[in-house]
Amino acid sequence: MKTAVKNLVISDFDMTFFNFKEVDNKIIATIFEKHPLILFIDNILWYVNSLGIIGNSMGGLKLRFIVYSILSGFRNHISYSEIFTNYESMYKNLVYKKYKRKIWMIKGLENKGYTFRILTNNRFAAELNMYDIIYTKNKGKFLKEVNPEYLLGDNYWDDYRNCPKCTKYINVGNGILSKLHLKNITCIKNMYEVFKVL
């Protein structure tokens, strides 16, 4: 194995290491299969999220569940606690399987000489106790303290604004806002393309 000398931080486990939108859509579609209005609103929220303008947080996820619970009405009402419990269970099951299929990426990055950490502010992910995942409620503070050489993320607000002096930024997705603010940024479609740019 090559000497690990390049410091890489993967700033968002959910949106960079795997396709969180795909997982979230599957869970929400299952929970709210009898609520087309909620599914329509959810698609709009995901479009806004894809622009990288809004940061992601557990607080935001919980607020989303509260609103969806209210919108579920009376006839097919779903309580907040039921939504939360079902979401957590399905998330952990789906994500654990996806993560196990991508362990080779960690080894590949190590072999290319990168020391790295994977950040998450998602308590569900943290409770899976997976390799090299660090749980933090304040990613911004962590990134400022670590100040990595390379930063891989998906959201300007959550990730890049906290590390203005990185040698290179890699964005998973379109990164519209990120491209407006950063010069040394490369966009990739998914994590499978990371080896083309690192």
Enumerate the language-model features and the residues they cover.
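A metal-dependent, Asp-based hydrolase signature
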Residues: 40-92
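Short, solvent-exposed loop/turn segments at secondary-structure junctions
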Residues: 16-18, 23-24, 123-126, 156-158, ...
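Short, acidic loop-to-helix structural element flanking the phosphoryl-transfer center
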Residues: 86-117
